């Protein structure tokens, strides 16, 4: 199963864990990472992840996130098709960077796009064929097979 984690998901473990929602999303993201390490899930990467991570002012976070690139099965680089698809996603309310992430996931033929961004999850019906999910939903509904 091929997945795309957006920048919000990669950064979730570094957020303040006082909120139960953030703690649950962190635990789910860490579980997903373990599934990647065990080759149960196939992680993808993109030029937008590379760019956003390079802009992170915290060297430790930047390096820890960048280390995941070696475990990826594919990387998406900018193409006219990705740019065009991103523009379509923007017409449905995705911000520019989010739209590029979504378009990269489509180009990589990912089964799931995982994000902790509530706004993207609330607009998921506009981003088909991608299945946009929060990491907690993905773990409970997909990996553990709960309806």
Walk through the language-model features, giving the residues of each.
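Acidic, PIN/NYN-like endoribonuclease modules and their adjacent C-terminal/linker elements
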Residues: 2, 16-26, 91-92, 106-147
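Short, well-structured N-terminal submotif of metal-dependent ribonuclease cores
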Residues: 1-45, 54-62, 139-147
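Short beta-strand scaffold positions
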Residues: 77, 96-99, 115
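Alpha-helix capping/helix-boundary segments
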Residues: 9, 49, 82, 100-101, ...
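Acidic catalytic patch
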Residues: 48-52, 69-91
């Amino acid at each position: 199963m091929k997945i795309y984690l957006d920048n919000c998901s990669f950064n979730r473990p570094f957020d303040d864990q006082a909120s139960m929602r953030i703690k649950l999303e962190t635990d789910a993201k860490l579980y997903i990472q373990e599934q990647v390490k065990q080759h149960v899930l196939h992680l993808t990467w993109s030029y937008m992840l590379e760019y956003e991570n390079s802009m992170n002012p915290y060297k430790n976070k930047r390096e820890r996130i960048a280390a995941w690139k070696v475990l990826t099965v594919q990387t998406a680089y900018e193409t006219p098709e990705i740019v065009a698809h991103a523009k379509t996603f923007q017409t449905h309310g995705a911000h520019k960077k989010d739209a590029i992430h979504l378009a990269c996931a489509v180009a990589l033929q990912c089964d799931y796009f995982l994000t902790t961004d509530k706004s993207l999850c609330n607009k998921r019906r506009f981003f088909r064929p991608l299945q946009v999910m929060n990491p907690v939903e993905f773990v409970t509904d997909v990996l553990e097979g709960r309806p």
